[in-house]
């Protein structure tokens, strides 16, 4: 039975896969990966920073959305990889553990956030990681923070064949009302500046350097609202490409390349995509 990935990505684009695997816990995830054996597969969290080809993919997809348990251990928190970031932020607020407020409103799972070292407003999730449990060569093992590289929208996990299963994170005590005030401020800013009313895959491009703001650069080129097919540069924030109506993978890819070309011509800067791209069953 085929499953449409367009039903599982926030931008509402994606072809069909023959197998969609939804493990209920870490143990069933481990079993599923071992059962798949030589069958090619890709891991998916909540599909929020992902662009998938329209054609059918001859792979299995393992989605971690049911791995969403959180366990508190003093000022440390053990989180399963499929846990939505929003849920973790609300849990931390109730537990009066501060630091991750900047992530409130970032869509996606904890595993996906660790994979790309998600961040916003000067904070990055990698700052709070104590250890990560991964599934490697069919077995689960823990990596300490000293064994993990985190960079700007980058991590060890983009370079090696391992699957994030659980994360141990460390936070500091903070009053609930202080945490809530920060979270309210961040979500207000997101609502004001980001196109949360339309399907998208989030911020499309990485910032090439600290003083170069991609959205402002694209806006300066007069490209807000520019459209190819159903894919459109957001009129609210030029760093986002939205699905304005029946957009295809090809529409979005053409728009990405068009923007990269124009920015290169004007500013001499090569933009790299932040959004993950699946094409021919591979990550790009």
Curated annotation (Swiss-Prot):
The uppermost taxa in this organism's lineage are: Bacteria, Thermotogati, Thermotogota, Thermotogae, Thermotogales
Q: What does this protein do?
A: Cell wall formation.
Q: Name one GO molecular function term.
A: FAD binding
Q: Which domain of life is it from?
A: Bacteria
Can you give the residue ranges of the FAD-binding PCMH-type domain? 12-174
Q: From the Swiss-Prot or TrEMBL record, state where the protein is found.
A: Cytoplasm
Identify the catalytic residues.
153, 203, 274
Q: Which GO terms describe its biological process?
A: cell division; cell wall organization; peptidoglycan biosynthetic process; regulation of cell shape
Q: Do the record's keywords include NADP?
A: yes
Tell me the pathway. Answer: Cell wall biogenesis; peptidoglycan biosynthesis
List UniProt keywords, sorted A-Z.
Cell cycle, Cell division, Cell shape, Cell wall biogenesis/degradation, Cytoplasm, FAD, Flavoprotein, NADP, Oxidoreductase, Peptidoglycan synthesis
Q: Which family does it belong to?
A: Belongs to the MurB family.
> Could you identify this protein by its name?
UDP-N-acetylenolpyruvoylglucosamine reductase
Where is it mostly found?
A: cytoplasm
Q: Which InterPro entries match?
A: FAD-bd_PCMH (IPR016166), FAD-bd_PCMH-like_sf (IPR036318), FAD-bd_PCMH_sub1 (IPR016167), FAD-bd_PCMH_sub2 (IPR016169), MurB (IPR003170), MurB_C (IPR011601), MurB_C_sf (IPR036635), Oxid_FAD_bind_N (IPR006094)
Q: Does the keyword RNA-binding apply?
A: no
Instruction: Quote the catalytic activity from the record.
Output: UDP-N-acetyl-alpha-D-muramate + NADP(+) = UDP-N-acetyl-3-O-(1-carboxyvinyl)-alpha-D-glucosamine + NADPH + H(+)
Q: Which cofactor does it need?
A: FAD
């Amino acid at each position: 039975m085929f499953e449409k990935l367009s039903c599982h990505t926030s931008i509402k684009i994606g072809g069909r896969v023959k197998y969609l695997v939804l493990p209920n816990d870490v143990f069933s995830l481990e079993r599923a990966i071992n059962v798949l054996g030589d069958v090619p597969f890709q891991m998916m969290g909540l599909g929020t920073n992902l662009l998938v080809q329209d054609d059918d993919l001859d792979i299995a997809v393992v989605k971690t959305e049911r791995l969403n348990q959180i366990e508190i251990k003093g000022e440390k928190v053990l989180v399963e990889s499929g846990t939505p970031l929003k849920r973790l932020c609300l849990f931390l607020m109730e537990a009066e553990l501060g630091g991750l407020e900047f992530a409130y409103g970032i869509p996606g799972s904890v595993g996906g956030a660790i994979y790309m070292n998600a961040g916003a407003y000067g904070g990055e999730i990698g700052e709070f990681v104590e250890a990560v449990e991964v599934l490697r060569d069919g077995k689960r093992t823990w990596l300490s923070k000293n064994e993990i590289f985190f960079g700007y929208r980058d991590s060890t996990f983009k370079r090696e064949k391992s699957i994030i299963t659980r994360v141990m994170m460390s936070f500091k005590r903070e009053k609930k009302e202080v945490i809530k005030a920060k979270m309210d401020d961040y979500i207000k800013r997101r609502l004001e500046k980001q196109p949360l009313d339309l399907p998208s895959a989030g911020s499309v491009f990485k910032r090439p350097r600290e003083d170069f703001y991609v959205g402002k650069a694209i806006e300066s080129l007069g490209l807000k609202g520019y459209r190819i097919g159903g894919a459109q540069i957001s009129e609210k924030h030029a760093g986002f490409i939205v699905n304005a109506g029946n957009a295809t993978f090809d529409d979005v890819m053409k728009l990405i390349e068009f923007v990269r070309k124009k920015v290169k011509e004007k500013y001499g800067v090569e933009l790299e995509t932040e959004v993950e791209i699946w094409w021919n069953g591979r990550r790009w």
